[in-house]
């Protein structure tokens, strides 16, 4: 009880806290999320078609991006339901564009940007200055859109890379949640997550899925290990406070940096080959 109280106090007092709420079926949702993503990527592998993989992952993950845009928008605009609807639309459209492959990422970013600019032109009821308002709107919608679009587009570069990232991030999230939800400090969870990620990285090192070799898979695993905890902190920075309610954003937080950076590196890797 005392440990739980200390945990909640830390979350409340830290602007960039990464909370581990245990109420509700968190583990069930986490397992379903993992099955959905792996199943979508595996569908592309089974069909031996990168387009199928990108479309399937976008279909699974884009609604979560839209929900993250809605919940993050709600954290910033709790009394303005129209605003959070627009951030949800921008996040969803930006994310689903990833089904078009690598070009879908910048296209999705522009689509999300256009939606937000259109909203700014239509709605005049905010007290915030336009630039400040745009900053908050962009925070609510664009990072999750780019992350999901990048994850979907990664399948067009290499289905093996897409599945590898999903496995590494899922391992990190599982270890982080299991240990972090019972810890009174902010370090034990991420450390446990990195141990889990390292175990999966070792298996991938043995398998060496295309397009990786023994060196590149280790490099990509290290990048994922750096990006996962930083993505969680970035998610906190996107909210008014780190402990604000946005479970869909938290479902995607480890991908916020990992997916775009992996996509860029994977493009470089395949270009060299």
Task: For each feature predicted by the language model, list its residue ranges.
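Mixed-charge, low-complexity intrinsically disordered regions
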Residues: 1-4
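Perimembrane helix-loop junctions in membrane proteins
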Residues: 75-78, 236, 270-271
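Short alpha-helix carrying the canonical HExxH Zn2+-binding catalytic motif
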Residues: 171, 188, 231, 248-249
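Hydrophobic alpha-helical segments of membrane proteins
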Residues: 194-206, 230-237, 259-264
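Transmembrane alpha-helix interface/packing and boundary motifs in multi-pass membrane proteins
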Residues: 226-227, 246
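Juxtamembrane boundary at the C-terminal end of a transmembrane helix
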Residues: 264-273
């Amino acid at each position: 009880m005392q440990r739980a109280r200390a945990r909640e106090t830390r979350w409340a007092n830290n602007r960039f806290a990464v909370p581990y709420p245990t109420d509700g079926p968190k583990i069930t949702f986490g397992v379903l999320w993992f099955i959905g993503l792996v199943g979508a990527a595996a569908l592309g592998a089974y069909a031996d078609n990168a387009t199928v993989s990108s479309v399937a992952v976008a279909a699974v993950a884009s609604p979560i991006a839209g929900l993250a845009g809605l919940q993050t928008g709600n954290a910033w605009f709790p009394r303005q339901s129209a605003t959070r609807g627009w951030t949800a639309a921008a996040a969803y459209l930006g994310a689903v564009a990833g089904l078009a492959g690598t070009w879908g990422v910048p296209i999705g970013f522009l689509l999300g940007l256009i939606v937000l600019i259109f909203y700014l032109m239509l709605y005049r009821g905010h007290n915030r200055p336009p630039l400040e308002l745009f900053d908050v709107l962009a925070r609510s919608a664009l990072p999750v859109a780019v992350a999901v679009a990048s994850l979907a587009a990664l399948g067009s570069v290499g289905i093996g890379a897409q599945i590898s990232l999903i496995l590494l991030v899922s391992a990190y999230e599982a270890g982080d949640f299991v240990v972090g939800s019972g810890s009174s400090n902010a370090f034990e969870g991420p450390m446990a997550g990195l141990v889990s990620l390292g175990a999966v990285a070792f298996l991938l090192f043995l398998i060496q899925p295309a397009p990786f070799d023994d060196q590149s898979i280790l490099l990509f695993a290290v990048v994922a290990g750096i990006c996962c905890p930083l993505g969680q902190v970035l998610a906190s920075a996107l909210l008014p406070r780190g402990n604000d309610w946005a479970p869909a954003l938290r479902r995607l937080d480890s991908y916020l940096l990992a997916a775009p950076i992996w996509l860029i590196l994977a493009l470089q890797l395949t270009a060299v080959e």
